[in-house]
């Protein structure tokens, strides 16, 4: 895959899912399309929240190409939701050996101008949208209101009213708020 870089800064984020899915030796059973959705969602949110425009989605799937097709279709749909051309979705599957556990890796590559780096301003208010949810401790089922959608974050970032944004991961809201405060100057 070749891509022209129309800006001066690359923003790269990645995430993995392992042992969560429909395969025989998975520890936590889950729909493969939903696994793909969540696997793409985390790095897409990280790139969008950094103020970058996502350009490329790279997926690495530890399963054969035929069984991976529903996941690849979901990656293309997620890419489109984030403003990525579905033709800029690329990746690899494991067709050389049989696998019995789900393994997903997703990398998002985005671009931004140096001056576009989001920065909190004095007097800004911290607002939480959604809640940190993670398997196996939580029921990570489709349709939960606490799971913020990529299109919602895109709209927030494009509104001009959000100065800084960060997806809350497994560290929790307090840890992420401290990260925002430490970069606010």
Where are these regions (language model features)?
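Glycine-rich phosphate/pyrophosphate-binding loop regions near the starts of catalytic domains
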Residues: 1-72, 76-133
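Short, hydrophobic/aliphatic alpha-helical segments
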Residues: 33-36, 151-161
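Short, surface-exposed connector motifs at secondary-structure boundaries
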Residues: 52-56, 157-163
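Glycine- and other small-residue-rich loops at beta-strand/loop junctions that grip anionic moieties
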Residues: 60, 142-145, 166-169
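Glycine-/charge-enriched secondary-structure boundary and capping motifs
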Residues: 74-85, 99-100, 159-185
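Active-site glycine-rich loop that binds ribose-phosphate moieties when present
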Residues: 90, 107-117, 141-157
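Short, solvent-exposed amphipathic alpha-helical segments in soluble enzyme
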Residues: 122-123, 142-145, 177-184
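Short, Lys/Arg- and Gly-enriched loop/turn segments at beta-strand edges
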Residues: 134-141
């Amino acid at each position: 895959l070749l891509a022209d870089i129309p800006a001066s800064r690359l923003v790269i984020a990645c995430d993995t899912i392992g042992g969560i899915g429909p395969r025989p030796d998975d520890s936590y059973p889950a729909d493969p399309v939903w696994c793909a959705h969540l696997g793409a969602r985390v790095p897409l949110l990280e790139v969008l929240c950094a103020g970058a425009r996502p350009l490329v989605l790279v997926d690495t799937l530890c399963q054969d190409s035929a069984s991976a097709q529903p996941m690849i279709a979901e990656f293309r749909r997620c890419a489109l939701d984030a403003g990525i051309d579905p033709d800029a979705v690329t990746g690899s599957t494991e067709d050389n050996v049989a696998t019995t556990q789900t393994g997903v890796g997703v990398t998002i590559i985005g671009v931004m101008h140096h001056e576009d780096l989001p920065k909190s301003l004095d007097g800004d208010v911290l607002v939480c949208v959604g809640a940190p949810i993670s398997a196996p401790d939580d029921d990570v089922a489709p349709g939960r209101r606490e799971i913020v959608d990529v299109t919602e974050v895109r709209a927030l970032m494009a509104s001009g009213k959000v100065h800084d944004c960060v997806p809350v991961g497994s560290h929790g809201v307090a840890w992420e708020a401290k990260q925002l405060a430490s970069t606010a100057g």
